Amino acid sequence: MDKFIGKVGTVIVYLFLTANALLVLGPVIWTVLASFKVGNNLFSSSFTGIEFTLDHYRALFNDTPYFEWYKNTFFLATANMIISLVVVTLSAFIFSRYRFNGKRNIMMSILVLQMFPAFLSMTAIYILLSKMGLIDTYAGLLFVYVTGSLPFMIWLVKGYFDAIPTSLDEAAKIDGAGHMTIFLEIILPLAKPILVFVGLVSFTGPWMDFILPTLILRSEEKMTLAIGIFSWISSNSAENFTLFAAGSLLVAVPITLLFVATQKHITTGLVSGAVKE
């Protein structure tokens, strides 16, 4: 009887996982097929017997400034990744290894900042950037990206740094190493998994974002992929839905490859950074 119940439970679990996989992969498969489908109709009762083509991809590269959008987005994502890594690692190292007055209060303030959704501050962000003259600039957009992700990232990386034994620091100091040497040659190499996670998250944020670029950027030559593709499809309504599917697929491919290539580091970094030994 127990074996029967165990088998039934296993079947139920597999059915549940299969249903979830279909819910996740279904829209992806549909988008991939739609991007190769002849015609402009994204919706179809069936994909059987439908002719496929590469015309949508040709039109995307020939009729739109897609490479310009790609370049702008890549610049923003890369700049945000580099700046975030530098600021987050230095801040986390200071909070993890140094003792100073107000440290606890600062950490609690950072923790409280994580509780407020970014959408609550959209109006304040726009007014602030307008006063600073940063509307329609990449500097303004990067300012929002970097400062918005700092609270969560600092706490996460600090937790990982805390798990690195301080005895390594002390041994290095005995050998004559300074604080920066300890940071660069001991802490950072041991923190590679969490740094990969932070870098990837910092890169994918601007790459996939639509709301903030729409709020801040105004010039067509500064458009990102999300804004450019949306503007292109909305200009001719339903005529460009299959082209939109092709563009969306090309946006997702680099991120998917990055996640697959760094999956091991992401899992290790996230779990280790969340638990202090």
What are these regions (language model features)?
Residues 2-277:
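A structural signal for multi-pass alpha-helical bundles of membrane permease subunits
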